[in-house]
């Protein structure tokens, strides 16, 4: 079972836009050293939308290589064309990922029937465990708990990342999907409550820059220690909101660069680097979270 503190890893890039694999290796080592429980490679935070498929597979493959079995790597396999998602899934099945994370098809707004057919087709193309991913704020489609429940019977669909921030869904998903179905928060601001309500883990943006504290918060919440989880979480709360002052992963990449975790904060168009008016806000939030800014 993959649970606990899972980082939605950024994809570091050089100033010319190419992937910076040296920085990627350092990031993987950093997270292993800090106790991160698993790594998601090339999800939303990893700029999946602007990496061509061949490059996408290479980044996931290299992440697996750098992790060297010390921490599970989950590969992003979402696409808005089912045929493309199937092709990507088949390629990722060959590189050693522990699981895959598939966002709902975006822009074309499938019905529940379409979502079910999409995920069944993707799951049928591999034996690797599949995690569904619902983030309607980015995809324009909301996969309701009732739709998720229709997919529980697919043997290699093992869980869902729920990123709406609607905590009522934790109880509803658990009721409909059973105790063995894995529930992951995709919203840092409500992650602590999500875990205390019975979630299994958090796939986090903030974890990129505060992995040790975030891991401690997750461990406390999973152990049912609400008071300790709150005390760890409180200094991080400003960070959770400020990391979304512009579209993810713009702020977190800038922050990682300021910390010296990556050599360059470059991000691919149509996203651009963090606006100057956000710099002070993010530095203030990082300082409150006891992050050293270089």
Swiss-Prot record:
Catalytic activity: L-aspartate 4-semialdehyde + pyruvate = (2S,4S)-4-hydroxy-2,3,4,5-tetrahydrodipicolinate + H2O + H(+)
UniProt family annotation: Belongs to the DapA family.
Source organism (scientific name): Shewanella baltica (strain OS155 / ATCC BAA-1091)
PANTHER family associated with the record: 4-HYDROXY-2-OXOGLUTARATE ALDOLASE, MITOCHONDRIAL, DIHYDRODIPICOLINATE SYNTHASE
Name of the protein in its database record: 4-hydroxy-tetrahydrodipicolinate synthase
Sorted UniProt keywords: Amino-acid biosynthesis, Cytoplasm, Diaminopimelate biosynthesis, Lyase, Lysine biosynthesis, Schiff base
Class of enzymatic activity (EC top level): lyase
EC number: 4.3.3.7
Stored PROSITE patterns: DHDPS_1, DHDPS_2
HAMAP family in UniProt: DapA
Keyword check for Amino-acid biosynthesis: yes
């Amino acid at each position: 079972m993959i649970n606990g503190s899972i980082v939605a890893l950024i994809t570091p890039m050089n100033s010319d836009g190419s992937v910076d694999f040296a920085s990627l290796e350092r990031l993987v080592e950093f997270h292993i050293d800090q106790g991160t429980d698993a790594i998601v490679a090339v999800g939303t935070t990893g700029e999946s939308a602007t990496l061509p498929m061949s490059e996408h597979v290479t980044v996931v493959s290299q992440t697996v290589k750098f992790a060297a079995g010390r921490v599970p790597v989950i590969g992003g396999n979402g696409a808005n064309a089912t045929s493309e998602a199937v092709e990507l899934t088949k390629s990722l099945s060959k590189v050693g990922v522990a699981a895959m994370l598939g966002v709902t098809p975006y822009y074309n707004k499938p019905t529940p029937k379409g979502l079910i057919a999409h995920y069944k087709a993707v799951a049928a193309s591999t034996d690797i465990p599949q995690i569904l991913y619902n983030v309607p704020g980015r995809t324009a489609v909301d996969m309701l708990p009732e739709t998720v429940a229709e997919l529980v019977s697919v043997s290699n669909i093992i869980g869902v990342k729920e990123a709406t921030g609607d905590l009522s869904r934790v109880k509803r998903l658990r009721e409909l999907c059973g105790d063995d179905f894995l529930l992951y928060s995709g919203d840092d601001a409500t992650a602590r409550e999500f875990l205390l309500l019975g979630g299994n883990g958090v796939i986090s943006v903030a974890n990129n820059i505060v992995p040790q504290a975030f891991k401690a918060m997750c461990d406390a919440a999973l152990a049912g220690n609400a008071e300790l989880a709150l005390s760890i979480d409180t200094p991080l709360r400003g960070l959770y909101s400020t990391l979304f002052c512009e579209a993810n992963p713009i702020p977190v990449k800038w922050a990682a660069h300021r910390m010296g975790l990556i050599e360059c904060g470059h991000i691919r168009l149509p996203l651009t680097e963090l606006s100057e008016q956000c710099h002070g806000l993010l530095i203030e939030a990082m300082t409150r979270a006891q992050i050293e800014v270089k």
